[in-house]
Amino acid sequence: MIERGKFRSLTLINWNGFFARTFDLDELVTTLSGGNGAGKSTTMAAFVTALIPDLTLLHFRNTTEAGATSGSRDKGLHGKLKAGVCYSMLDTINSRHQRVVVGVRLQQVAGRDRKVDIKPFAIQGLPMSVQPTQLVTETLNERQARVLSLAELKDKLDEMEGVQFKQFNSITDYHSLMFDLGIIARRLRSASDRSKFYRLIEASLYGGISSAITRSLRDYLLPENSGVRKAFQDMEAALRENRLTLEAIRVTQSDRDLFKHLISEATDYVAADYMRHANERRVHLDQALAFRRELYTSRKQLAAEQYKHVDMARELGEHNGAEGSLEADYQAASDHLNLVQTALRQQEKIERYEADLEELQIRLEEQNEVVAEAAEMQDENEARAEAAELEVDELKSQLADYQQALDVQQTRAIQYNQAISALARAKELCHLPDLTPESAAEWLDTFQAKEQEATEKLLSLEQKMSVAQTAHSQFEQAYQLVAAINGPLARSEAWDVARELLRDGVNQRHLAEQVQPLRMRLSELEQRLREQQEAERLLAEFCKRQGKNFDIDELEALHQELEARIASLSDSVSSASEQRMALRQEQEQLQSRIQHLMQRAPVWLAAQNSLNQLSEQCGEEFTSSQEVTEYLQQLLEREREAIVERDEVGARKNAVDEEIERLSQPGGAEDQRLNALAERFGGVLLSEIYDDVSLEDAPYFSALYGPSRHAIVVPDLSQIAEQLEGLTDCPEDLYLIEGDPQSFDDSVFSVDELEKAVVVKIADRQWRYSRFPSLPIFGRAARENRIESLHAEREVLSERFATLSFDVQKTQRLHQAFSRFIGSHLSVAFEDDPEAEIRRLNGRRVELERALATHESDNQQQRLQFEQAKEGVSALNRLLPRLNLLADETLADRGDEIQERLDEAQEAARFVQQYGNQLAKLEPVVSVLQSDPEQFEQLKEDYAWSQQMQRDARQQAFALAEVVERRAHFSYSDSAEMLSGNSDLNEKLRQRLEQAEAERTRAREALRSHAAQLSQYSQVLVSLKSSYDTKKELLNDLQRELQDIGVRADSGAEERARQRRDELHAQLSNNRSRRNQLEKALTFCEAEMENLTRKLRKLERDYHEMREQVVTAKAGWCAVMRMVKDNGVERRLHRRELAYLSADELRSMSDKALGALRLAVADNEHLRDVLRLSEDPKRPERKIQFFVAVYQHLRERIRQDIIRTDDPVEAIEQMEIELSRLTEELTSREQKLAISSRSVANIIRKTIQREQNRIRMLNQGLQSVSFGQVNSVRLNVNVRETHATLLDVLSEQQEQHQDLFNSNRLTFSEALAKLYQRLNPQIDMGQRTPQTIGEELLDYRNYLEMEVEVNRGSDGWLRAESGALSTGEAIGTGMSILVMVVQSWEDEARRLRGKDISPCRLLFLDEAARLDARSIATLFELCERLQMQLIIAAPENISPEKGTTYKLVRKVFQNTEHVHVVGLRGFAPQLPETLPGTQTEDTPSEAS
């Protein structure tokens, strides 16, 4: 026998008065004895808190503040705790001998709300030796201990091997563990279940009859028949769904044509517009691409024209600039020619003037010579006259002196005086103060030498004077020539400059002689330089045209390469037309082939669509017509096999349905007639009595009763013997067993149980051996199990039958589709894909177009290359002869060098031309420049000074000589000699004076005549000089003008200037002709550019419009495509065969479908509005929305339980397959599902009878319970009168109310509610719906009234109410009821829990002193009989001889409050044993 679980102990940690206290609980009754405030209620509160840790329920009334409102947070728990961590733990051992410690950690929460934090936990696998207090406390010393926190407890337990610690976040999980381990009797799944459990504990704790429990005894004692209720609900739901499905089938059948019509027209309407937009989008894209290609081509042409225009404009600009420069050069050349001609005329004038000047120069020179000679003669005459005058004066002076001397005494004294005078004059003249007559001789030699020197110098000066006098006029002429050539200069420099000019003149004449050769060489070099420049220009132009720079060495190779290229390009250009013609012919052939394929493509696409549908339907790929015909034969064979299998599955399904119907009979009667016979005989079916047999026991009882398991148990067989006569409506074998149906057991047989079998000894000579059936059906659990397996099998069979039926129909339709395909499309379906061929041909056409464009481009490029090569060869033909010129890099330098030499030579020629005559005249007279004509006066002064010096020297020598001569006169003088000498001298002087005067007269006459002649000559010279100066000034002006003209007026200058002008004129003419050509070409290019620009603007406008249209359409198209893909309708709308229809044909098709759709959706407001919106041509997505709306509308009208698809098109196909079959099947299903009102009444009655029997069994346990005047307690269960009437009507008079139960608009629950209202019109149903009322009427508990009755004294049986009973009687009665509830819970929960667990039973009773000793003894007896633990509390010991008693005394020690506990076990013959650990006081210590 399974042992019942027990609570071993209760541990309180840190509660008020209990620091660490463990109460060992007795197996029966534990008594808490003590005065008021001793801690009895606190201990019980700790137990209840650990049992139900739900703060929303805990409410300890005796400690709640008096007058507290419901808003108070404190429900009596906060004040029972101390600050810090608190624990309440229950140590239990279950039926499996597993020790389980469950409990809660409590902690006061700071604040005014007096909240308590609770954390439930459980400990499993704890060794028996470990006490609970050891787990949660830590001993610090002998007098102190500390309470561990929950985390520390967890860590401590984790260190213990085999111990499991669980902390729970929800109370449901906590109670679930306690239920599974057998600590509580009922699984508390919800707050409502916890509330019931707490109300039970509360009623037990506070005693008395709980009104909360007695009012809801049905909820506590009667189990909810959820299986029956769920069966009714499932049945109703199935019926409702069945009816809705049948109605949907009928509606769908009526709307099938509308489906087809609506889908067909909607598809045509939307697909035509969809494909038209797709075609238009493709056309627009093609047009946009064509526009873009043409735009790019035009842009390239415009860019080429622009480049060409830029090149021509640049070239024109160059030519314009060159023309300007050429015009300027031409004008300059013309002006230069004019200047040269002017210069030549000027040169002629200059030459005439120079000739005149030369003539005047000659005459002027001649006249100058004449004047010079006249001046010289005049000077000579003047000198002669002056000399004559001087001589006359000197002679007169001498004559006077001598005359005077003649008058003095010619004495020696005079001589002496004269000697002295001579000596003094000698001293004075010779500046010799120390001169003596003796030294006079010496000084005389000296002064004579000086005189000789002075005389020589004077002679030299005389010679110079003579030369100067003769060259005076020549010097002036030579100086004038030098000044005219060199410009103003110092006269002292004239000789050196003249010599330099003569030397330079020789060089200049040499250079001037080279002018003509140099000019010819320069002309030749300039011509070559111009040719070189022209060649360089041609080379630069050639390189520019070729786009590459070439070296001179590469030109010949390039010329050969270009000639070879011309030869090859000429062949390519000549063959290009043939290639173009071949490409165009191939293009035309491709176009005709594409047109043919486009006509054939729709037919092929229709065949492919049909073939694809067949492939999708059958899951096969067909590659030839032979495979199609072979598959058709396979379909026929498959159809035959499927039909055979469908019939087999249908037969098996019907058999399962019959078995389910048979097992579903009320009471387990497999034959419906047995129920009627049982009611007729007043008995009960044996299957009903054993209806509660568990699934494990079902095989045993099924084998025990064998064939008699369908027997009827009757109270008395003799009373029904007469009824058996003439009984025909019954099974072949009817078993009747005599016995009390309320207390029937299996004692009527003698049974031996074997291994999976029994031997039943029916009689001494008749045994029956029955094996346990593998599939028992005895008892409700076995039947439900079998029915459940049959239902599962039936579901599989139904699904298989439906699948096979659908496959048969599908195969038949597939056969028809194959037949249609073979008749219509087989001939074209397996031909090559025309669209692939079209794509290939289009690709080839694009390649041809590209090849043509490339060919045209290449041809044009080749022509351009050909022209460029020809131009390059032409340019090279002009360049190659001038390669030497191009290679001659020194030509310009040589030209510059020759130019410089020519300039020097021309400068020399101009110099010679200008000064040649002067140099020729200067050369013979250059020597006269050695003496400056302006130094003649100086020379004369020098001569006069030399003469004076010679005279002074002569006088000094004469004085010295006179002194030397008169040395004798110093002594004496011969006076006779002196007198005779003086007379001779005087005579001579007179003669000479006369001669001198005559000479003076002649000199004066000659001077006057020569002066007149000199004046005449001077006048002629002045006139010549004036004419010469005028001519010279004019010549200088002409030379300046010639210099200002700045040209060389040589003999070839005019020819060169004219040739240069003609060359520039030719270049200018060529430039102007080229410019005119360029202007014309530029005008044509501008016109072409303007045309291209207009075309480009138009193309850009068209392209942008088209692109904007494409982009706009793309945005709409993207929305359309997104909508199409999101809704999965692309396959329906993208009908490729429509792509080959024109826009008008598609628009016509869409318009026709639109007209049909307007009529089709006229009655549907939503579709009508969507269709009206979809007619907007600018919003193509609205047509998709309409199509989706149509599909959605059709999907909503498709029942998924009927048709296994969301696609209305497939739904239409499946409709035709499924509708007829489903109609049949659902009709039969409804007939099978429909339950009769009689069956419902029988089920409810049987359930009521079963529960009444169970309550009677519970009452048997309460018969011996007595409390005070209460002798017995029982539960009375009665059927309500209104509900009994309802059951009678359902079972007997259901025909009168078939209008309710046969109505398709009402469910069975609603019909039952309507019937209840019809039978009880006086009852107000309130706001409840018929469905709710009907569901309540299907619950058997609502048919019963349950109340507690007590047999009290002389009053007999009366209703148990607290007012009619004493306090002790009420407590005992309430406790009895609670024990009954606990037992009922255990019976109800037995199926949910393991069979090897018997849960703990424990109740509370506070203030048990209100019971007398007899009542207490009754409680003890009840606990012993029911194996129940009880915790009671009373001020005094109630029954210390039984159970365990704890004496609690609250004491205060040193301001510390604690409870002193003493525990005693019940009295026995031996001395009472003190419980361990209860003799010492519980002295709490402060936690360190």
Curated annotation (Swiss-Prot):
Q: What is this protein called?
A: Chromosome partition protein MukB
Query: A single GO BP annotation from the record?
Result: chromosome segregation
- Source organism (scientific name): Salmonella paratyphi A (strain AKU_12601)
Record's subunit section = Homodimerization via its hinge domain. Binds to DNA via its C-terminal region. Interacts, and probably forms a ternary complex, with MukE and MukF via its C-terminal region. The complex formation is stimulated by calcium or magnesium. Interacts with tubulin-related protein FtsZ.
Subcellular location(s): the record lists: Cytoplasm, Nucleoid
Q: Name one GO molecular function term.
A: ATP binding
Q: Which family does it belong to?
A: Belongs to the SMC family. MukB subfamily.
Positions binding ATP in this chain are: G34, G35, N36, G37, A38, G39, K40, S41
- Specify where the region named Flexible hinge lies, as residue ranges: 666-783
